[in-house]
Curated annotation (Swiss-Prot):
The protein's name in its UniProt record: AF4/FMR2 family member lilli
Family: Belongs to the AF4 family.
Source organism of the structure: Drosophila ananassae (Fruit fly)
Biased composition (Low complexity): 140-169, 305-318, 354-426, 476-496, 629-663, 763-802, 853-869, 902-911, 940-956, 1049-1060, 1297-1313, 1477-1497
Keyword Cell wall biogenesis/degradation: no
Gene Ontology molecular function terms on file: DNA binding; transcription coregulator activity
Gene name per UniProt: lilli
Compositional bias segments (type: Acidic residues): 334-345, 562-576
Pfam families documented for this protein: AFF4_CHD (PF18876)
Stretches with biased composition (Basic and acidic residues): 319-332, 973-990, 1135-1153, 1162-1184
Positions of post-translational Phosphoserine modification: S341, S343, S724, S725, S775, S777, S1261
Compartment(s): Nucleus
């Protein structure tokens, strides 16, 4: 029965194959001409790809390694290991490689379905003509299908084989059956292409010849970049399968179905390039795979031109889409840089990307979150494909008849669908075309990448894949989008042709209809400055360099929001997924990233076209409907693609369907780091005034795509810079943009990431999965200070249309550091509890993003996740005001607004969802209370939005956060605490990611700005320690203090905000005369990570502020002052100017002018480190209770500060009165100290006094010791002063507590309160190290008593003889050295009697010590301890030799002086005969050969008189002593350091005085004797224990 069934099944399969073949042949014949034309147009692409293979392969490999941080393990080996196993088909493969024509002929004639994978498939052009008969695309599909349906065995193996194909592992007959099964799953009938050969024969032929070989061969061929780039055998094989539509890798991996792989490649190219072939791409079932293959084989993928011809409307879109991709290519470097951060995220992405194209990695890089979603999408299609495969397998498992029947039905249905789709595409008009095109692109992307891969790569996936993936939209759309999808998916890099595709690379690069072949440029050759079309059909649109300044993760391109609104929501899901995949592929394949598309893509793009910008990029849709549609689209798209993207806030996270031909897909210049969320970002420019809160309605962004593209992406990138400052403040706060609502939408997706925000790139938005550096560091917003590389580019946001306008909110402000006042989009009402968590996730990224892109991103996310929220947000969005809180002056208003934002701030602050929820609850209320004035527009529901503005205003970063925290006080504090607790986890990952991203070597800086990576985590960690104190203080002080005075903020802002202010001033063109860098300077302080705790532990270290060594705890302890400083309490007037008491300078002043903050990026690394160290010391020494986060000045611009200064003139006067006049002179910045700050300072000091009174003494003691040791005397400090803890001013400036002498009652009270404890603890006496003066040397010489001198000599002689007889080496050398020093004493005594005898004694002693020096070398048998002691003795010997040599010179110095004078005269006058010169000589002047040969002649020279010669000899001797003295001394020093004997000699120096070249012989004697005694004691001590 089984055999009969099998035979019947085979028969049915053959019939089905025949039917399918006839159908397919008709379709193929119809499409053949089109494809052939396309092929002709794209053939150049193939050649180009082949030529560029090595270079592209190398580049892709490097990129992947760099991006993933993963070293590709023997990818080539893995790739070629399996592929290299060539069967007898080697000759054929070789022919294919060498001669495509021959290979093609062979395949066409002898095989049914391998045209692509078989060597013959190599030449698409050759194949194209032959395709009709073998069009066996059929080869792959028909072969596979035939095989699968033709042979029962194939069918039996089909299910497993299909899976095996996916696994890529599988060779031999098993793959063959899978091929068949794949085919069958595709649909047996799809095989019309095969030339009705006996299917069994064809299958056997393929199995025998091509089973392993075709795929393997292709994979092995150097021309298979994809293969080479990816390890097919490795764990990533699935990745390749998913991503590669042709998925030669996955299919090759399933060598069993070389046909499949070819089919898949063919299918994918046809879908991409052949989308025009509605039927071909539409062959969802096996027919699709077959047609896909057939079109691919028959028609090289139609160049974009051909594709456009087939589907003119769609084609136009693909062109633009490709154009975007081409632009993406431009940003590949950025992508690469960004890719570094996605190391963890990449794998999933890679799996999705790498299979299809190396471009996948590029795309994932361009938009991590986008790539994640795309990978998710790929994964989803893959599951679909898998489902199809499984279903098909099941069908195959079912009675063969039923299976065949079903397959036939499926094929017919697929054909019908394809035909319908094709007409639809052709007939599609306007929006429908756009939609379909979008779908085509998306479907093409999914189909091409996932769909194709699914369909052709997975067999049944072929049927279901195209149908399922592109399903209604689009097989046909896929064809029209084919240009784009082929360019995007398979030609992302151009490149990596699938194995089947390998030789028909042009398929992957369909050219736009209007494009000529010459227009395509190789990635290497592509000049982004010159307009052109890449092989993939991507158009290169030259953009200003500034556009690329942002590190941009390529964002997914969305179709017009309108189209989406029109009902493309469903399509959008698929489209977005597909597009994301495509874009990922494009980005990977095309060196240009979509960012490049910014300008040109926008041409002809309507506002909707702009709306097509990825949702993440679009800050806000101007219309709710559009927004809602997007939300639904992204949500439908399986919120996995758009939701996850939005939640990830990856630029490409949400992919709006590619704009239709009319809708130029605009990729905003948004940084890959920060994708602008659709939530309308407030485009608030700079906060108008530091003291005022400016609410500005967000206008729709200008449609000009260029601006928007530039600004959004770049801004996103630059936004991180603002974030860097913002991040300094509990970064999460402002990130708490009203992302709550936004978060709410994307919450499902984002919520999970929220926890993972620690992982910068991987996590969706927060992690930086959004591709935002800021997102990555958003979790540790303080860490990700500097993602705002491109923040300066405000114009981008302007370019955005209304929806862009929503985004606009942050971008312009973000672009300038200060400008980051993106109004929190009116997020969906705080009511959403889950959103808060998401918001926190968003917040993480947004805090990185500086709220602008981040808030925008989260808004977009939320909109995508929940259309309702999005709609609300959108409506609000329109109403959204950009609230810029000038944190400084905003005081009450800021507090109110920030309060509302405080909740979002809590979210943004990096608090977990719980914090966010709590914040939302509290801040929602506070918002209702505080926000009412602003509420009318949108704020009612979006308390977070205000918070967003709070966070967004970079100048207000800390101030805003401060306001929010003061208003929400306890909540903020709690959030900060939690934030600090959590940040250490996420911050580390984010920091590493940011570091890599911004590493100039990685191209992160991109000459777009300087990225200073600084870690504020230290402050946050300290905040944890101080949390309890702060929690108590903050509620009390917050109301009294301006929002920017929030203690936590004050601390973080002190460091980060001043940096931010710096960056902002540079970044904000409006505010600053300084030309803004292309991107803001990102300041990410990583240094504080590890040091904080260490520094905290080391409170002993004197705090160095402004270069002063004033210990922070110094106030607590009165230190004994060396050098005549008064130890007792000293009036303030007596304070040394070098250690003035410094009031806390104005926050703005510090931010602007503080040395540490001003242009830190330009400071030397050492200087920055020193400043940071000082700041950390101040922070650690500051009691936690006193730790106040200095609120950053609301405005970063200098003139705002000036204005503030004027306003504070009265306060300054008061401060001056409070401070000593000398201090004023010393500290100009104290003038900027605000009275309220001073008051707070006093209060803090008083509060700290109680706590510090007890600890003052302990801290003082260590400090005292350090001071005593320090070369600089500590400044005199009164006891009262000591009690008052010094207050840390903003970053660089530390204010010492006001002296007790200060007249101010407040100061007096502050001092007096702590005074009693200070008095109670008298300063402990400080041990003074006494160093001898050179002139204090002992002048007393031993008596000239001859008996004493003789005694020294006798001692020396005795020791010398004892040493000669000593058997022990150590004792011998010590005795010799003792004899030497006694000889030195004798010589020194003799010096008074006879200098000549003394000289002789020293000289003999030197000879003796040199003679015995060899004994200092330890014997090999000596133990380690003995060797060490011997080495020390040798060092002492070297010292003695050096001093003896110098002594010998000194004894002859007078003679040497005379000799030098005589010789100088001789050489000056030139007296002396010149040999062979002017004077006659006995030597013949001739230089004849004869005379020279005789040897009687000497070379020309001067005759030196004998006396001069003798003098020269003496001089040489004397000067050699000087030389030897210094050489021997240096040798001794080197030995000390080399042997780690510094401690030993340091101790000797302390006990006996340092030994120098000026030491007397008595000092030498004492020093050496002490050293020898110590060594003997050590030896005897070690010897006794052993005994």
């Amino acid at each position: 029965m089984a055999q009969q069934q099998q035979q019947q099944h085979n028969h049915q399969t053959s019939n089905n194959n025949n039917n399918n073949s006839s159908i397919l042949l008709l379709q193929q014949q119809q499409l053949h001409q089109e494809q052939l034309q396309q092929y002709n147009n794209n053939l150049y692409s193939q050649n180009y790809n082949m030529e560029e293979y090595e270079r592209r392969k190398r580049r892709e490999r490097e990129k992947i390694e760099r991006q993933q941080g993963i070293q590709i393990d023997d990818r080539e080996t893995s790739l070629f290991g399996e592929p290299r196993r060539l069967t007898e088909a080697d000759a054929d493969i070789t022919a294919a490689l060498g001669e495509f024509g021959d290979a093609r002929v062979y395949i066409n004639q002898s095989t049914v379905g391998i045209s692509r994978h078989t060597p013959g498939a190599g030449n698409p052009r050759l194949q194209a003509p032959l395709q009709p008969p073998p069009k066996s695309l059929g080869h792959s599909p028909s072969y596979t299908g035939s095989t699968g349906s033709a042979s029962a065995s194939a069918n039996s193996a089909v299910p497993s084989q299909q899976q095996q194909q996916q696994h890529y592992n599988g060779t031999g007959g098993r793959f063959l059956p899978p091929a068949a099964s794949k085919r069958s799953s595709s649909g047996a009938g799809q095989q019309p292409l095969p030339q009705e050969k006996d299917i069994s024969k064809m299958i056997s032929e393929m199995a025998d010849n091509f089973r392993v070989t075709p795929l393997t061969s292709i994979a092995a061929t150097p021309h298979a970049p994809v293969r080479e780039n990816y390890n097919l055998n490795g764990p990533n094989k699935n990745k390749y399968m998913d991503d590669i539509i042709s998925s030669p890798l996955s299919q090759p991996s399933s060598l069993m179905t070389p046909l499949f792989a070819p089919i898949a490649p063919i299918a994918s190219p046809p879908q991409t390039s052949q989308l025009p072939l509605g039927g071909a791409t539409s062959l969802t079932g096996s027919s699709e795979a077959v047609l896909g293959l057939a079109p691919l084989q028959q028609l090289p993928p139609t160049p974009p031109k051909a594709a456009s011809a087939i589907t003119s409307p769609a084609a136009a879109k693909p062109l633009k889409t490709e154009k975007n991709h081409t632009l993406e290519k431009q940003d590949s470097c950025l992508e690469n840089d960004l890719e570094l951060s996605e190391s963890e995220d990449e794998q999933p992405k890679k799996e999705g990307r790498s299979a299809g194209n190396s471009s996948n990695s590029s795309e994932s890089d361009s938009s991590e979150s986008g790539s994640e979603s795309s990978s998710k999408n790929d994964a989803q299609p893959l599951p679909n494909h898998k489902l199809h495969h499984q279903q098909q397998q099941q069908l195959q498992q079912q009675p063969l008849q039923q299976q065949q029947h079903q397959q036939q039905q499926q094929q017919q249905i697929l054909l019908q669908q394809q035909q319908q789709q094709r007409p639809q595409q052709l007939t599609a008009n306007g929006k429908s075309e756009k939609k379909k095109y979008k779908h085509a692109i998306i479907a093409g992307g999914s189909n091409t990448i996932t769909g194709l891969l699914t369909s052709s790569g997975f067999g049944s996936g072929g049927n279901g894949g195209p149908g399922g993936n592109s399903c209604g939209p689009g097989s046909g759309a896929s064809a029209s989008a084919g240009t784009m999808s082929s360019g995007g998916s398979s030609s992302n890099k151009t490149p990596s042709p699938t194995e089947s595709n390998k030789w028909t690379l042009s398929r992957f690069f369909p050219k736009p209809a209007n494009q000529t072949n010459t227009e395509s440029a190789t990635p290497g050759n592509v000049s982004m400055k010159v307009p052109g079309i890449l092989p993939g059909g991507a158009q290169i649109i030259p953009e200003p360099i500034e556009v690329s300044t942002a590190i941009v993760k390529n964002e997914k391109i969305h179709d017009d929001p309108m189209d989406m609104d029109d009902g493309e929501e469903d399509d959008d899901d698929e489209d977005q997924q597909q597009q994301q995949q495509q874009q990922l592929h494009y980005r990977a394949d095309l060196s240009v990233t979509p960012v490049s598309v910014k300008k040109e893509a926008i041409d002809g793009v309507s506002e909707l076209g702009l709306a097509a910008i990825p949702k993440n990029q679009i800050k806000r849709e101007s219309s709710e409907a559009l927004h809602a549609s997007r939300l639904s689209d992204s949500g439908t798209s399986g919120s996995s693609s758009s939701s996850s993207s939005s939640s990830e806030s990856a630029p490409g996270g949400e992919v709006v369907p590619m704009p239709g031909p009319g809708e130029t897909l605009q990729i905003p210049g948004g940084a890959a780091i920060t994708s602008v969320m659709r939530v309308p970002p407030t485009l608030t420019q700079k906060a108008p005034s530091s003291t005022s809160v400016t609410l500005m309605p967000i206008l729709p962004l200008p449609m000009s795509p260029k601006q928007r593209q530039k600004k959004q992406r770049k801004k996103k990138t630059s936004t991180p810079i603002v974030n860097s400052s913002d991040e300094d403040e509990p970064a999460p706060k402002h990130p708490g943009l009203d992302y709550t609502a936004v978060s709410a939408h994307s919450q499902s997706t984002a919520t999970a990431p929220a926890k993972k925000r620690g992982r910068p790139r991987k996590q969706q938005q927060q992690s930086g999965g959004s591709g935002n550096l800021s997102s990555a560091s958003a979790g540790s917003s303080s860490q990700t200070k500097g993602p705002t590389l491109t923040a300066a580019k405000k114009p981008l946001c302007k370019a955005l249309p209304a929806m862009g306008g929503a985004r606009k909110r942050d971008h312009s402000s973000q672009s300038s550091s200060n400008g980051n006042t993106p109004t929190k989009k009116m997020a969906t009402p705080m009511s959403v509890s889950a959103p808060p968590k998401t918001a926190s996730v968003h917040r993480d990224s947004s805090s990185s993003d500086d709220d602008s892109s981040s808030s925008g991103g989260s808004s977009s996310k939320s909109s995508s996740s929940s259309s309702s929220s999005d709609d609300t947000e959108e409506a609000q969005n329109t109403n959204c005001r950009i609230v810029k809180l000038n944190k400084t002056g905003a005081g009450a208003v800021a507090a109110k607004v920030l309060l509302g934002s405080g909740s979002s701030s809590a979210l943004s602050s990096g608090s977990e969802a719980e914090d966010q929820a709590r914040s939302q609850a509290g801040s929602g209320k506070a918002l209702a209370q505080q926000m009412p004035p602003y509420k009318p527009q949108v704020m009612s529901q979006h308390s977070q939005q205000l918070s967003s503005s709070e966070c967004s205003s970079s100048s207000g970063d800390r101030g805003g956060t401060g306001a929010g925290s003061s208003s929400s006080g306890e909540e903020d504090e709690a959030r900060h605490e939690k934030e600090r607790e959590r940040k250490p986890k996420s911050d580390k990952n984010k920091i590493s990611t940011l570091t890599r991203i911004f590493n100039p070597k990685e191209g992160g800086a991109k000459k777009q700005g300087q990225v200073v990576i600084m870690d504020l985590q230290e402050e946050q960690q300290q905040g944890k320690l101080d949390a309890a104190t702060q929690s108590s203080q903050i509620p009390a002080t917050a109301p009294a203090v301006k929002p920017r005075m929030t203690p936590t903020q004050q601390l973080q802002q002190q460091h980060a905000q001043s940096q931010q202010m710096l960056g902002t001033s540079l970044a904000s063109p409006a505010r600053t005369t300084t030309p803004h860098l292309t991107s803001l300077i990102c300041k990410i302080d990583l240094s504080k990570l590890s040091r904080e705790r260490i520094m905290r532990l080391k409170k002993l270290t004197p705090a160095q502020q402004n270069g002063h060594l004033t210990p922070k705890g110094q106030a607590a302890s009165a230190v004994q002052m060396p050098n005549g400083y008064a130890n007792d309490a000293v009036p303030a007037a007596k304070v040394k100017p070098e250690h003035p008491v410094k009031p806390e300078p104005d926050a703005d002043y510090e931010a602007k002018f503080k040395p540490g903050s001003v242009k830190q990026e330009f400071q030397l690394k050492q200087e920055r480190d020193r400043d940071r160290e000082r700041e950390r010391e101040r922070d650690r020494e500051q009691p936690p209770g006193r730790r106040r986060k200095r609120s950053s000045s609301s405005s970063s611009s200098p003139y705002k500060e000036k204005k503030r200064k004027k306003e504070k003139t009265d306060q300054l006067q008061i401060c001056k009165e409070l401070l000593p006049s000398n201090n004023h002179e010393r500290i100009p910045n104290h003038d900027r100290l605000s009275y309220d700050k001073l008051q707070l300072l006093h209060e803090d000091a008083a509060a700290a006094a109680a706590a510090s009174g007890v600890g003052a003494a302990p801290n003082g003691s260590p400090r005292k010791n350090l001071l005593a040791m320090s070369p600089l005397p500590p400044p005199p400090i009164s006891t009262a002063i000591a009690i008052v803890p010094p207050i840390t001013c903003n970053e660089a400036v530390q204010t010492t507590p006001p002296l007790t002498t200060s007249t101010s009652p407040q100061a007096a009270s502050a001092v007096t309160e702590p005074a009693p404890p200070a008095v109670a603890v008298p300063p402990a006496p400080v041990t003074r190290l006494i160093y001898r003066s050179y002139f204090d040397r002992e002048e007393a010489h031993p008596s000239a008593d001859l008996r004493r001198n003789n005694q020294f000599l006798q001692e020396a002689v005795n020791r010398k003889h004892a040493a000669d007889a000593e058997p022990d080496s150590f004792n011998q050398v010590t005795l010799y050295l003792e004899a030497v020093v006694y000889f030195l004493l004798t010589a020194d005594a003799m010096e008074r009697c006879s200098s000549e005898a003394t000289y002789t004694m020293y000289k003999d002693t030197l000879s003796l010590i040199k003679f015995i020096s060899f004994k200092f070398r330890p014997q090999h048998s000596a133990n380690g301890q003995t060797k060490t002691h011997m080495a020390k003795v040798a060092i002492l010997s070297l010292r003695c030799q050096s001093l003896i040599s110098l002594k010998l010179y000194n004894l002859r110095r007078a003679n040497c002086r005379d000799i030098i004078a005589s010789l100088t005269d001789f050489f000056r006058t030139g007296r002396g005969d010149i040999v062979n010169g002017n004077t006659p000589s006995s030597i013949s002047p001739s230089n004849s050969v004869g005379s020279q040969g005789s040897g009687s002649n000497t070379p020309p020279g001067r005759i030196v008189p004998r006396d001069i010669h003798n003098q020269l000899s003496k001089q040489n001797e004397y000067l050699s002593y000087v030389h030897s003295a210094h050489e021997l001394w240096d040798q001794a020093d080197h030995s000390v350091r080399k042997g780690n004997h510094t401690d030993f000699f340091r101790e000797l120096d302390h006990e006996n005085g340092p030994l120098t070249l000026h030491s007397t012989m008595h000092e030498v004697f004492r020093y050496v004797q002490a050293g020898l005694k110590t060594l003997r004691d050590a030896v005897s001590h070690t010897a006794h224990p052993t005994q």
